[in-house]
Amino acid sequence: MAAQQRDCGGAAQLAGPAAEADPLGRFTCPVCLEVYEKPVQVPCGHVFCSACLQECLKPKKPVCGVCRSALAPGVRAVELERQIESTETSCHGCRKKFFLSKIRSHVATCSKYQNYIMEGVKATIKDASLQPRNVPNRYTFPCPYCPEKNFDQEGLVEHCKLFHSTDTKSVVCPICASMPWGDPNYRSANFREHIQRRHRFSYDTFVDYDVDEEDMMNQVLQRSIIDQ
């Protein structure tokens, strides 16, 4: 049991910089960067969501996205799943405690959490307005595998699906890196799975940049609630 917990922690530490400061980081899948859903432990000891693992197993010679060892079907991580069901966390809005497995459904309807998100958006916009206007290109992106560039989000997803389906190299997501919250040094454990899950459509689908600040924040808030 202890060995399994250590392995789960090892996978989470590689899930991203936030995991180091987040005590719940050990419950984070290194592929989708979400709380494990139906966690499965593979032979090398690392853990993935069941759906993420199925995608990782699709290449002819699949490898673990964390340690790059040969990847094979694993076994259900029953103890980790039990911990997710029994570990408590607090809502950032109302401060009430919920089990980790229930927090998403709660924040979708918590008005105080919605206010918390709104204040965060306002603070981000205010801070950005004080910075020099050096806005990165967020409309076209280079392929992280080859010299091809000028893809929109959908085009990059399709390009990688067609021409890089067998590439296993860890690369930086150019879409995430261009965003204010993105880490330009973080290498995705499975980039193709990452963009297919996270960037299936453009951010322009969600935000109209021509509307005023208040309307834009409301749009972002509503979309974040829908996507919970």
UniProtKB/Swiss-Prot annotation:
It catalyses: S-ubiquitinyl-[E2 ubiquitin-conjugating enzyme]-L-cysteine + [acceptor protein]-L-lysine = [E2 ubiquitin-conjugating enzyme]-L-cysteine + N(6)-ubiquitinyl-[acceptor protein]-L-lysine. The keyword Methyltransferase does not apply. Autoubiquitinated. Polyubiquitinated in the presence of E2 enzymes UBE2D1, UBE2D2 and UBE2D3, but only monoubiquitinated in the presence of UBE2E1. It is found in: Cytoplasm; Nucleus. It comes from the Eukaryota. Its main location: cytoplasm. Zn(2+) binds at residues 91, 94, 106, 110. InterPro entries: Di19_Zn-bd, RNF114_RING-HC, RNF_E3_ubiq-protein_ligase, ZF_C2HC_RNF, Znf-RING_euk, Znf_RING, Znf_RING/FYVE/PHD, Znf_RING_CS. Pathway: Protein modification; protein ubiquitination. A zinc finger (C2HC RNF-type) spans 91-110. GO terms for biological process: cell differentiation; protein polyubiquitination; spermatogenesis; ubiquitin-dependent protein catabolic process. PROSITE patterns: ZF_C2HC_RNF, ZF_RING_1, ZF_RING_2. The keyword Acetylation applies. It is an enzyme of class 2 (transferase). The modification N6-acetyllysine is found at residues 102, 112. Keywords: Acetylation, Cytoplasm, Developmental protein, Differentiation, Metal-binding, Nucleus, Spermatogenesis, Transferase, Ubl conjugation, Ubl conjugation pathway, Zinc, Zinc-finger. SUPFAM superfamilies: RING/U-box. One of its GO terms (cellular component) is nucleus. Interacts with XAF1, the interaction increases XAF1 stability and proapoptotic effects, and may regulate IFN signaling. E3 ubiquitin-protein ligase that promotes the ubiquitination of various substrates. In turn, participates in the regulation of many biological processes including cell cycle, apoptosis, osteoclastogenesis as well as innate or adaptive immunity. Acts as negative regulator of NF-kappa-B-dependent transcription by promoting the ubiquitination and stabilization of the NF-kappa-B inhibitor TNFAIP3. May promote the ubiquitination of TRAF6 as well. Also acts as a negative regulator of T-cell activation. PANTHER family: E3 UBIQUITIN-PROTEIN LIGASE RNF114 (PTHR46016:SF3), ZINC FINGER, RING/FYVE/PHD-TYPE (PTHR46016). This is E3 ubiquitin-protein ligase RNF114. It comes from Pan troglodytes (Chimpanzee).
